[in-house]
UniProtKB/Swiss-Prot annotation:
Family in the record: Belongs to the RecA family. RadA subfamily.
Motif (RadA KNRFG motif): 261-265
PANTHER family: DNA REPAIR PROTEIN RADA (PTHR32472), DNA REPAIR PROTEIN RADA-LIKE PROTEIN (PTHR32472:SF10)
GO molecular function, one term: zinc ion binding
GO biological process: recombinational repair
Source species of the chain: Mycolicibacterium smegmatis (strain ATCC 700084 / mc(2)155) (Mycobacterium smegmatis)
Identification of the protein by name: DNA repair protein RadA
Chain residue ranges for the region called Lon-protease-like: 359-466
GO cellular component, one term: cytosol
Span of zinc fingers (C4-type): 12-29
Stored SMART domains: AAA
Amino acid sequence: MAGSKIRSQYRCSECQHVAPKWVGRCANCGTWGTVDEVAVLAGNNKLNGAARRSVAPTSPAVPITSIDPGVTRHYPTGVSELDRVLGGGLVAGSVTLLAGDPGVGKSTLLLEVANRWAHSGKRALYLSGEESAGQIRLRAERTGCTHDQVYLAAESDLQIALGHIDEVKPSLVVVDSVQTMSTTEADGVTGGVTQVRAVTTSLTAYAKAAVGDPAVAMILVGHVTKDGAIAGPRSLEHLVDVVLHFEGDRASSLRMVRGVKNRFGAADEVGCFQLHDNGIECVSDPSGLFLDQRPLAVPGTAVTVTLDGKRPMIGEVQALVSPPAGPPRRAVSGIDSARAAMIGAVLQTRCRMPINSNDLYLSTVGGMRLTDPSADLAVALAIASAYFDIAMPMKAIAIGEVGLAGDLRRVTGMDRRLSEAARLGFTTAVVPPGVTSAPAGLKVVAADNIRAAVQTMREIAIAGAQ
């Protein structure tokens, strides 16, 4: 091994950028606290070749067909909407990260999960680093989650928390939250990047190594930053098996759990909940809940059907176009601002509507985030409805993607979207060309471009008013 040595590098855990010395902030991605010292092997080709020599495996490789799939089967949590997102339930030995804004209802949801888990004959342990056991007990009484197989421990030291797991021997562990846990095996302050990564790594290793029937399934609560990202390095998401985002507007009781990553099922599913003073409940038909709260037809509103994973959901867009008191303003909520600006520019250019010289306000109802391109046409018709001061009929929807040329394009799952619209009682659908079939009771009106769609909207509105 002559001529070779171990040397140090300073590498960013976010972007893998290598710095010549330690710095607090990565010069490449600008993230704070992600530059760590790592040891690398440097030397001649002989050493590198020796380092690549094989080692006898402790267990042989086997054909994939000989592996028992039951080892990683799903265990239902008892919360149907969460099971929907998880692909059927929690997998033994898995680690799930649930992230969301403070106060959105993460602790309430997971206390309900622990209670349902206990009701199925299994034991759950709730570890809290943010609240005392007495505070959790008060919430449990308020929400009716007081099963005697739900164990509580207020602990922020990781080693002691692992001792609680060894003593209680649960099959489900909830850690609320991973940012409040600390370990003596890593430097840094509690909640810092180094500590969060070390705690998550230790918990993941424990879950994978645990034995039992079933093994321990863990759910970690994670905080989010101001821009909605999970607090801590992005490598945190790579350490866990499942990443879920808990979303919702504080002005609304509707909450959504959205799958971002899932090693055991589809990663694009969404579950719907309603938060009450006495707990949280599943909403199996969120579209019906939305329609119950919808007011009478007014100018500036349009309805569409989006697809969140495999679930069709109704979404309402509201727009307001008004003369400016100064420089024209733009305010967008629940819709991508760049896409909203693009749709406004298309209306300005293709339909000769002076959108750019007016104030424009766009919002979704109930705190929904419309990222599906199928909502483009509804956004455009909501703006046109507000500009012309004409209300679209209550039973009309719009589905389609808008191109820069003003053309309308079909979106995936059109049959499923139209079936959902017909089920909810809609009678007219404005869609792009090429839709040849429609469910009974739903009239499909095809528009070649955005100009034709706006004209169709005006004709439908006038006919509905007569």
